[in-house]
Structure formats: structure tokens, C-alpha cells
Amino acid sequence: MKKQELISFLEEFAPKQYAEHWDNVGFLLGKKEEELSKVYVCLDVQRRSVEEAIAHSCNFILSHHPFIFQGMKSVTGDNEQGRLLLTLAEHKISVFSMHTNFDSVKEGMGDLICSKLSWKKEGVLQEVSPGLEGISQGIGFYTRVDKAFSCEELAAYVKEKAALPYIEYFDSGKPIRKIAVCPGSGKSFMKDVIALGADAYITGDLGHHDAVDALGEGLSLLNAGHYGLERFFVPYMSEQIRRHFPKIDCVEEEEFFVGKIL
């Protein structure tokens, strides 16, 4: 099987036009006409993931976050990105990334996390294009729950459902029924969430001033970390590939929370 066959499947699963204008998704490194051996699926292309891909004889890496994001003027061994690119090329390992396009499509990140939390999606935070067959497509989602949570109860619920080692929460003191979620880094949608009338917002990469501003608007915040919710991309896309290509072996990145809390 050629790499092109897998690339075509991935491009159909999460079309490039659903990506944000600033994003860099798709086939980023390699030759499409080469034979595919094994696929390594990860969140980020970093030293440990490249070494694991080599150790497992994988010649194709599927990542969520794009490895090549901003313009590069040279590829040398003087920095880590250059060293990794040279290593990947030396071992003929291709790289394909599905980022905000995966976040936006039906059966992508939003639906995945909504299912993981056992909720029903009512809509998205930012529509990317008109929904197909009446289904809203876009980044993030919001839902309503029948029984109100306290902020502490919601934090405990999300921590258990998402198997998180830790979660940070900022309590407005209001009962929580309408909940907005954006896996990864969603602080840019804070105003949209407030305008939506949400009682709580679950996302990652939140800081002190984000919390102060949100609490002032009566919005509770849950900081699940950037990796906390997005890490489910790895087993989910591995399963999608196995389902469509039963003869292709997928190696999944082991869970690795970069940050540690004492």
C-alpha cells in the first residue's frame, strides 16, 4: 500500500478547507508514492516520538499539531526542529498533521470529547462552514445538562471522565447547566462563550487574568490543560486507520503529560 492511499483517507476525513487560515495542516514531509510500512500516531512531533517511530519501524507519522508551523529559512542541525527534520528525512519518515481541520469536522475533536464526557452537543463555538445535513460543524461545542453542577462537582466529573491527573477550576459560585468546551487552547473564544450565556467553560492554557476576567462575568472556568483533552486524538485516529486499513499496523504514542504538579 502506498502512502498516498492513507493520505487520501486522512484528507477526506478532515478536509483542509476546514482548517483555520493561519494553520498548516496536511502532508508536510515525505514522498507520497513510497510504500507504507507502519503508522505512528501522536499529538506532537518531538524527539521522543521520532525515536519511538524509528524503533517501531514506522515510516509515517500522523500528528495533531503541525510540525512545520511557521516559515523556515533553513534546515540545519543548529536547532531541534532542524535536527528532527533531518532525522525524519534520513529514515524516510513522512509527516501528516490534522489540526484545526480535525477540530472542526463532524466526528472530529468536538464530537470525540463530547462523547467522552457523555454529553450531547447542541452547537459549536465557532462555525467554520455551513453544517452538512443540518449538523453544525466548527470548533468547540456547548451542551446543557439536566441536573446542575457546582463548579467543584463539574471539575470532579470531567477529571474522572477524561482520566486527568489534575484539573484546575475557578468557581463563580453560580449553578452550572450550560457548558462550553474547547479542547486545547480556547481562551480566544472567551467572549463568544460569555455571549453564549454559558455557565462554565472547559478548555486549556488558561492563566490568572483569564480567570479574573471570566469570574467578573459570572463564568466558571475549568483548566484541563492543552494536552488533557486533545490526547484522545491518538487512540481515536489509530482506531479510524485500523478500521479502514486492517492490514496497516498503528503504533500509538504513550500518554505523556509534559507538565507535572507536585
Which residues does each PLM region occupy?
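Active-site catalytic microenvironments in core metabolic enzymes, especially phosphate/sugar-handling
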Residues: 1-262
